[in-house]
Each structure stands twice: as structure tokens, then as C-alpha cells.
């Protein structure tokens, strides 16, 4: 059976943090606040995958009250969720994701993000789409207060 899930995440930008998107560090004057590495792209994909199998959301599986996972790599979270999918006899078919940010420019990093995500999930790069757009200076994202991401995951369950 083919199933689909959708995910969304947003984090505030803060000084003194590294900006991690799609599992890679992107040069920027600020990074994203969060309990983990705050990688909004990986978090949105994680939620899409969990949604596709009806398994709740990232906060249920990796709560921000769990000090044992403080600072965890969001790529590690993706790997753990992929293992959960395999236990449920489900394979990832496709990921389509969009990052919404005023800065920095992300186009030069998209190919590497796709590779890191595809490797974490165990699918070909061609099955992972990552796009970037701005919020046209509207709202908190448009004022460069944070970065958001949304994702759709298609999975096949036996």
C-alpha cells in the first residue's frame, strides 16, 4: 500500500549556534535554536515519514525533555525513524521538501543536502527533492527571525 505523510518545522535563529540544514553545516552568522541540532529540514522530513505510517510526530519519539538526546544530530533521528519504518515493513519511495529562509542563499548546498538525506534514509539521491525559497519578507520568516521547512514523504508498506 502506498502512503503519504506531511511534515513541517520552524526554529528561531540565534547567535552562537551553527546553522545545520539537511545534515550539513551552512555558513551563516546565526544558527537555529533547539534541543537537537535544530535542523528544520530533517525534522520536517522526519515528521512526514512518521505521519506516513501513522506513528505520531518527532516530539513523541524524541521529546525535548529527554536530556539523553540533547544536541542529537537530526540525521541520526532520520536514521532511527527509517529503522522504525523498516520494522513496520515500509520503505521510503520519495521525499519532496522545501526550506523557507530569507538567508543564507541555499542553492549551492542543495545537492549535498540531498545526498546526506538520501544516504540516511537509504534511497537514491534522485528520490530526494530539496528546494529553497524565501517568504518574500513577510512574517517572522520574512523578517529573518527563523527558518522553516516542509516535506512530503511517499512510502510503500507491505
Predicted regions span which residues?
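The alpha-helix within a helix-turn-helix
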Residues: 118
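C-terminal binding/interaction regions
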Residues: 3, 94, 104-107, 123-142, ...
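Active-site phosphate/pyrophosphate- and oxyanion-stabilizing loops and adjacent acidic/basic residues
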Residues: 115
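RNase III-family endoribonuclease catalytic core
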Residues: 1-112, 121
Amino acid at each position: 500500500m502506498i502512503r503519504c505523510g506531511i511534515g513541517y518545522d520552524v526554529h528561531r535563529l540565534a547567535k552562537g549556534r551553527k546553522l545545520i540544514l539537511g545534515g550539513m553545516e551552512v555558513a551563516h552568522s546565526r544558527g537555529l535554536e533547539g534541543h537537537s541540532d535544530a535542523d528544520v529540514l530533517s525534522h520536517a522530513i522526519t515528521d512526514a515519514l512518521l505521519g506516513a505510517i501513522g506513528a505520531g510526530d518527532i516530539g513523541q519519539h524524541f521529546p525535548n525533555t529527554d536530556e539523553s538526546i540533547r544536541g542529537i544530530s537530526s540525521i541520526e533521528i532520520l536514521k532511527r525513524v527509517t529503522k522504525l519504518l523498516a520494522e513496520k515493513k515500509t520503505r521510503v519511495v520519495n521525499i519532496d521538501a522545501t526550506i523557507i529562509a530569507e538567508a543564507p542563499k541555499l542553492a549551492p548546498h542543495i545537492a549535498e543536502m540531498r545526498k546526506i538525506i538520501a544516504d540516511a534514509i537509504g534511497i537514491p539521491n534522485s528520490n530526494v527533492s530539496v528546494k529553497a525559497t524565501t517568504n518574500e519578507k513577510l512574517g517572522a520568516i520574512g523578517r529573518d527571525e527563523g527558518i522553516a521547512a516542509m516535506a512530503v514523504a511517499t512510502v510503500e508498506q507491505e
